[in-house]
């Protein structure tokens, strides 16, 4: 669950695989700024095919009498966020920290090479899978470098999540 959306575990019945479905909060689904940000997250993340970035499979909106709610279907990651691991275990070894950061940097380098800047990298947006793989997630406020219209970010606006 994030600021503008909720994430649910689901099954893609057609392909028989576990997925995560990120749904915009219903109260925000009528706000054009949030709709654009959500759409941009889906488009940006879908452009990125990297082992350390959560994959996006599909996007759409629910047919709803009370108004459509946008969603993103993505890879379901079994594991914990880096934030949760640090809170539960405290300090980690230099070797583990370096391995995690190396994979995060690889993912960010890949996204930057694709022209997409994450802009909210933090321990809560890094998952460590049950097998030890690293997955960067939540490109919700990412910006494509080619997007010269920074209409989504106003001058002097704060970007990211307050920690």
Please place each PLM-identified region on the residue numbering.
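Activation segment signature within eukaryotic-like protein kinase domains
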Residues: 100-101
């Amino acid at each position: 669950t994030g600021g503008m959306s909720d994430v649910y575990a689901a099954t893609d019945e057609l392909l028989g695989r576990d997925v995560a479905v990120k749904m915009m909060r219903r109260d925000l689904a009528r706000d054009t700024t949030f709709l654009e940000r959500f759409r941009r997250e889906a488009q940006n993340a879908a452009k990125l095919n990297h082992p350390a970035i959560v994959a996006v499979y599909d996007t759409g909106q629910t047919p709803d009498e009370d108004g459509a709610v946008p969603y993103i279907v993505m890879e379901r990651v079994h594991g914990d966020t880096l934030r949760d691991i640090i809170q539960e275990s405290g300090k980690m070894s230099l070797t583990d920290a370096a391995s995690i950061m190396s994979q995060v940097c690889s993912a960010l380098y890949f996204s930057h090479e694709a022209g997409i800047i994450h802009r909210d990298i933090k321990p809560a947006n890094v998952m460590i899978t049950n097998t030890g793989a690293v997955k960067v997630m939540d490109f919700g406020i990412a910006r494509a470098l080619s997007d010269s219209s920074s209409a989504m970010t106003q001058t002097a606006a704060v970007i990211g999540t307050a920690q």
